[in-house]
Regions:
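Short coil-to-beta-strand transition motifs
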Residues: 72-81, 107-109
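Structural motif
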Residues: 49-51, 64-67
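Conserved positions in beta-strands of structured domains
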Residues: 38, 84-86
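Extended, hydrophilic extramembrane loops/domains of integral membrane proteins
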Residues: 91-129
Length: 133
């Protein structure tokens, strides 16, 4: 009985370790950064509690209207919003959260760019938050 329980526990821990590797370490080798969504500004496209993967290797010049990007604000805060207007000459974007009624105040510069969203896993971020605690 103990050996069976031990095998199940080992299997579970191995599965959790592999899932962690696949969710966090493997994507980073391809330039992707996992981020947990904590606000509802991008709902319904990206629900609160999702994990999104952004790729910083996609160049700023290749971002177009409709793309979802992550960008940094002062104090280490990052934002994930949709590009609604692009100005390649000034090297800026206008962004807006899908759930917001108006565009974000101010422009986002190319220097603030953290990456383009590649894909998301809805609600998986809740699990990650629980495991971190």
């Amino acid at each position: 009985m103990i050996k069976a329980t031990e095998r199940i526990l080992r299997f579970f821990l191995t599965a959790v370790g592999m899932a962690g590797f696949c969710l966090f370490l493997l994507p980073q080798t391809a330039g992707c950064t996992p981020r947990v969504v904590i606000s509802g500004s991008m709902e319904p496209a990206v629900p609160v509690g999702s994990i999104v993967y952004t790729n910083r290797w996609i160049k700023q010049e290749n971002i177009k209207e409709g793309d979802i990007i992550a960008y940094g604000l002062s104090g280490g805060v990052s934002v994930l919003h949709r590009v609604v207007e692009t100005d390649k000459n000034s090297r800026i974007w206008r962004t807006k959260g899908d759930a917001n009624e108006v565009s974000d105040p101010g422009a986002v510069s190319y220097e603030q760019y953290l990456g383009k969203m590649i894909f998301s896993l809805p609600y998986v971020g809740y699990l990650i938050s629980v495991l971190k605690e």
